[in-house]
UniProtKB/Swiss-Prot annotation:
Residues 516-552 are cytoplasmic. It is found in: Cell membrane. It comes from Mus musculus. This is Macrophage colony-stimulating factor 1. The keyword Disulfide bond applies. Its main location: membrane.
Length: 552
């Protein structure tokens, strides 16, 4: 072989390297083709049928299981949703889906485990810091869980058939947008709860109580006065007075037990407590420190007055007969305010050390209509006895009842003052039956001074604090007086005296009976001894008599 021929030939190593490179390229291409064909056709219809058989073999139950799955509401990208759900489905198949060995369901679960392991090559795993993003805990039934798994495999199969490399997408940005773990984005239940309305609203007093009809005439007052009136802090003497017509005295509007003070419906009562010598404050300034006490006392008294159907009728009739010929534009009747008198007078610290004081009521006085409402006259209290009280209680309707300056009621001032200091809560809407109200009221108002002096201290300690109304509801007469006096309320002192007395009487009777029994038992043996000895004596005497008589 010449040198030229040798120089024109290629070395064998060069041909070997090129062949090896060609073989490597062909092999890599075939491997890539096999991988793509493997991912695209990895999920078959047989796997979906297995899942359907698992669903059909489950028992329908309401029991729920807890599992973690992707929150589709937070992750709207379908590719990233399936990519995140794949690793969660693996955990569910390995840990949650447990069946008895060698059963059809256990064999189906093993096939699903093999499928999920083969799909690992088709899914790329993102950073571990986004492992729990877009995931929340679900509480659903096993049927719903299997339905989720079936839908996952079905959607994954469809996407892999279109693009086998679709799950290599980087979803870190989508995962970063999700909120923290276990955050439910569903709207909360809009449950409508009854909201608390302020107490000044008439509709909030009670669902069964209509609004007070006396709210309409208060429209002409100032705003602050009307607000205080609705809040039950405005005194009755600060409200505009009204003159009653004799013809419309018996036409009463519907009554209400709301907590507002019905100023235009209440009659002008003649039974009022006398005022102190100090002048009243103006209408715009309520007395500080006493407003709460007056509010509680006014609420109790006005509710009791509203419960009686005959109270306002009797007083309206008497008021109409007081000045029937007086013109409307002339003088008006200025009533003295009982709660204001209570606020002006000092309160006692305790009621046990004080005796009841008889305070007379002041008759109505005629004043000039141009005179301010808050100005009143000062009177001196007078003491009366129980006979005058009963005489005024049973006065005929035709007789002048208000024009006479004589006192009309005797009331115990210690008891109402103590009752004003004790209660701290309102008793709106608590109305007793009419018969029980009149019985209790007549017992309190028609009790004699001796009974008041004897039982005031003991009753304050024995009985619970009862509601007090210084204005009588109606005149019930002698029959209701006896019925009211039979109220079984025994003071504690009487009880302490009665029990030892009864025990002493029983011991005395027992001692007498025992003494009588002993005396009889002691007398019976003597009678027996005498009876045994006497028949022998009598027989001997009879024989002697016979012997003496025979010779004769």
């Amino acid at each position: 072989m010449t040198a030229r021929g040798a120089a024109g030939r290629c070395p064998s190593s060069t041909w070997l390297g090129s062949r090896l490179l060609l073989v490597c390229l062909l092999m890599s291409r075939s491997i890539a083709k096999e991988v793509s064909e493997h991912c695209s056709h990895m999920i078959g219809n047989g796997h979906l049928k297995v899942l359907q058989q698992l669903i059909d073999s489950q028992m329908e139950t309401s029991c729920q299981i807890a599992f973690e799955f992707v929150d589709q509401e937070q992750l709207d990208d379908p590719v990233c949703y399936l990519k995140k759900a794949f690793f969660l489905v693996q955990d569910i198949i390995d840990e949650t889906m447990r069946f008895k060995d060698n059963t059809p369901n256990a064999n189906a679960t093993e096939r699903l485990q093999e499928l999920s392991n083969n799909l690992n090559s088709c899914f790329t795993k993102d950073y571990e810091e986004q492992n729990k993003a877009c995931v929340r805990t679900f509480h659903e039934t096993p049927l719903q869980l299997l339905e989720k798994i079936k839908n996952f495999f079905n959607e994954t199969k469809n996407l892999l058939e279109k693009d086998w490399n679709i799950f290599t997408k980087n979803c870190n940005n989508s995962f970063a947008k999700c909120s923290s773990r276990d955050v439910v984005t569903k709207p909360d239940c809009n449950c409508l709860y009854p909201k608390a309305t302020p107490s000044s609203d008439p509709a909030s007093a009670s669902p069964h109580q209509p609004p007070a009809p006396s709210m309409a005439p208060l429209a002409g007052l100032a705003w602050d006065d009307s607000q205080r009136t609705e809040g039950s802090s405005l005194l009755p003497s600060e409200l505009p007075l009204r003159i009653e017509d004799p013809g419309s005295a018996k036409q009463r509007p519907p009554r209400s037990t709301c907590q507002t003070l019905e100023s235009t419906e209440q009659p002008n009562h003649g039974d009022r407590l006398t005022e102190d010598s100090q002048p009243h404050p103006s209408a715009g300034g309520p007395v500080p420190g006493v407003e709460d006490i007056l509010e509680s006392s006014l609420g109790t008294n006005w509710v009791l007055e509203e419960a009686s159907g005959e109270a306002s009728e009797g007083f309206l009739t008497q008021e109409a007969k007081f000045s029937p010929s007086t013109p409307v534009g002339g003088s008006i009747q200025a009533e003295t305010d009982r709660p204001r008198a209570l606020s002006a007078s000092p309160f006692p610290k305790s009621t046990e050390d004080q005796k009841p004081v008889d305070i007379t009521d002041r008759p109505l006085t005629e004043v000039n209509p141009m005179r301010p409402i808050g100005q009143t006259q000062n009177n001196t209290p007078e003491k009366t006895d129980g006979t005058s009280t009963l005489r005024e209680d049973h006065q005929e309707p035709g007789s002048p009842h208000i024009a006479t300056p004589n006192p009309q009621r005797v009331s115990n001032s210690a008891t109402p003052v103590a009752q004003l200091l004790l209660p701290k809560s309102h008793s709106w809407g608590i109305v007793l039956p009419l018969g029980e109200l009149e019985g209790k009221r007549s017992t309190r108002d028609r009790r004699s001074p001796a009974e008041l002096e004897g039982g005031s201290a003991s009753e304050g300690a024995a009985r619970p604090v009862a509601r007090f109304n210084s204005i009588p509801l109606t005149d019930t007469g002698h029959v209701e007086q006896h019925e009211g006096s039979s109220d079984p309320q025994i003071p504690e002192s009487v009880f302490h005296l009665l029990v030892p007395g009864i025990i002493l009487v029983l011991l005395t009777v027992g001692g007498l009976l025992f003494y009588k029994w002993k005396w009889r038992s002691h007398r019976d043996p003597q009678t027996l001894d005498s009876s045994v000895g006497r028949p022998e004596d009598s027989s001997l005497t009879q024989d002697e008599d016979r012997q003496v008589e025979l010779p004769v």
